[in-house]
């Protein structure tokens, strides 16, 4: 949510934000009209209240004196004397008009609040102009795509052939766009989750959180996933709860309605959760297999920071996500997203795009965003710089660290072998009992040794 004062005083800046995102500014224009109408109504109500208070005072004096009190000359064109009963009747009419206007005012304020939720964040000056993926800017690349001496297969073929992911039996349980991880596949999935959580907590200093996967409507409004994307959510109608589309929805509300102390910032959290999105997508390589599912696993990073540090913290968050790609040996291109490709909450965002040799595509396993104070205003998360100082809104940042199913798919495609097996990345072997390869008989193991007491098992190769 943007500051209403900013919208009111700098509407052209907000219009430009809509234009940069390739969106119609109709919600802004409607909001400005509603704001003007609200202020007109407030002024009329206050004028009538003042009139009512003044005349009520006159009536009090009149009753106390037992007679009439002078009426201001020329008011309503009437005579100078006004009987008490007539004055009381007039005030009843004024009171009725105030009630009528207050009802209209409440409706206008509700409409203003609804429209304010449709205003996206203002893109940062460094965010490229554009509305399509082709207009994103590649800022750097890491790793060399592997050269195969055979035709690489897409992950869904490899996984089914190895019997480590079962789409058909998942469909028996829940319908299309679900999967069952089995055997070595379930082990690899769990290894990825534990590896990512360990990396972000032990090396990057995040605090692990395990939030609910159900959230109230106001929580998803605060994170920005409602109202725009309500059709994409799994909704429990009986109690108006939603299955979270990402842990960001929960973590953004962790300090809702709190005033934090500056010395506690930044607050950094990481959470693994299943995520649920009822996305509608067309058939194609970018939606097959594990790429777009109604339920998927994700490790999410989230930060509450001071405004002056948020852009630096975005680069740090991005580096934490890139570290996962690098340790797993997955080549990627880093895209700085153009304005039209960002979420409504983001002012600046990066997508590290992993190479999928079997699919023949670069696809993101993560998206890292700086939302400035847009989410914090919705969630009312503030901080004080010092004792007695006026509270300010924090800035919030989020990033996948990473999406587990997509990372699983990227590993399967990048580490596939000609015989149909998949080599396990070295960094994951200690999480898989020392397994170095997934073949058609499951995991193949190597000798595991403990180098030092208390260390994570390492694998001989």
PLM regions with names:
Residues 1-146, 164:
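N-terminal alpha-helical targeting/anchoring segments
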Residues 70-72, 82, 452-461:
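Low-complexity, intrinsically disordered short segments enriched for Gly/Pro and polybasic residues
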Residues 141-452, 457-459:
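TRNA-recognition modules of translation machinery and tRNA-sensing kinases, especially anticodon-binding
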